[in-house]
Amino acid sequence: NGCYKDSGDRLIEELENLLNQNIQIKKVTLIGHSYGGILVTHLLNNWKNTVTLDAHIIASPLQGNTSLNTLCGYKPEVNLKPMANLFEWRTQQDLDSAFKDLPKNPQNIAISGSFVTVLPDTYKGHRLGHNWSISWVADQLKKP
């Protein structure tokens, strides 16, 4: 139906199967960009495994919107479990083509325990907007 729950539940199931078959895995790292961040927050809210989960959410409208909230039952809340770490990478609203015309920044949400980074204006000579945000974060994550 285009909503995130079925895909999110499938992702949880597949990760659980992978972890059950590979007990040596001690940490899972997920990256969700834009609406992929909604999927990752669903996983965060429903994670029951004891394996550490690092979730990186990039330029994601975690406040939701009318259709997401109404049609899909999305609630803009994330409850981090002790074994989960959330890293929010937020674009500047006026530079993000997906968010710049909205009355308020849909990335702004208070999540207890989350680490928030607001991205700079530019990346390698480009306006650091919605799409370039993935590359910028990837560069940050590969730093030692």
Predicted features and spans:
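Active-site catalytic motif of lipid deacylating hydrolases and related acyltransferases
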Residues: 1-26
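A general structural motif
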Residues: 24-27, 50-52, 83
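C-terminal catalytic-base region of ester-bond hydrolases, centering on the histidine
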Residues: 74-144
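Gly/Ala-rich beta-loop-alpha elbow adjacent to hydrolase catalytic centers
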Residues: 31-41
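Flexible "cap/lid" loop of the alpha/beta hydrolase fold
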Residues: 61-79
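Active-site nucleophile loop of the alpha/beta-hydrolase fold
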Residues: 1, 55-66, 91-94
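Active-site signature of alpha/beta-hydrolase-fold catalytic machinery across serine-
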Residues: 42-46
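Structural recognition of the beta-strand scaffold that forms the well-ordered cores
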Residues: 29-31, 54-58, 86-90
